[in-house]
């Protein structure tokens, strides 16, 4: 009986787990300064999502929110979509700590949505749906 060869390439996945609690402020700053404003990277997306997901108290929430606002200013529509998604994580997961400031977030969401296309637009729409459901907004 002939033995079949594995026709699929073999590879190993590197498991990367990053949380804000494991990120030092210096690490967050390093990622934010090393990735150019008009580019994306896996590490930058990890920082953005962790900022939205891992705040454990009001001080961390305020820090995360300010960093997300800073990242939103980048000249990259994908980064803006990631930031909007992180805002939705704050809205859904961290509303017991603090609520999103609608007067700040809503104009950013509307602007990002109007300029977005493809998967960025879909991500922003999902974030809008999550924010609307969590905070009873009508974006």
Locate predicted features.
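HEAT/HEAT-like alpha-solenoid repeats
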Residues: 28-39, 66-73, 77, 107-114
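Residue-level detector of extended alpha-helical repeat arrays and alpha-solenoid scaffolds
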Residues: 41-44, 80, 121
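Hydrophobic core positions within HEAT/HEAT-like alpha-solenoid repeats
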Residues: 44-49, 83-84, 125
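Structural signature of alpha-helical solenoid repeat scaffolds
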Residues: 49-53, 88-89, 129-132
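Amphipathic protein-protein interaction modules
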Residues: 75-113
């Amino acid at each position: 009986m002939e033995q079949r060869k594995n026709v699929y390439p073999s590879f190993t996945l590197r498991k990367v787990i990053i949380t804000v609690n494991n990120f030092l402020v210096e690490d967050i700053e390093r990622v934010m300064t090393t990735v150019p404003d008009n580019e994306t990277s896996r590490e930058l997306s990890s920082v953005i999502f962790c900022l939205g997901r891992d705040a454990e108290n009001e001080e961390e929430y305020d820090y995360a929110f300010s960093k997300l606002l800073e990242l939103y200013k980048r000249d990259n529509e994908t980064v803006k979509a990631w930031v909007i998604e992180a805002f939705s994580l704050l809205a859904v997961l961290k509303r017991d700590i603090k609520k999103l400031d609608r007067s700040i977030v809503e104009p950013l969401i509307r602007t990002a949505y109007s300029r977005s296309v493809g998967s960025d637009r879909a991500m922003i729409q999902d974030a809008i749906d999550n924010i609307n459901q969590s905070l009873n907004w009508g974006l």
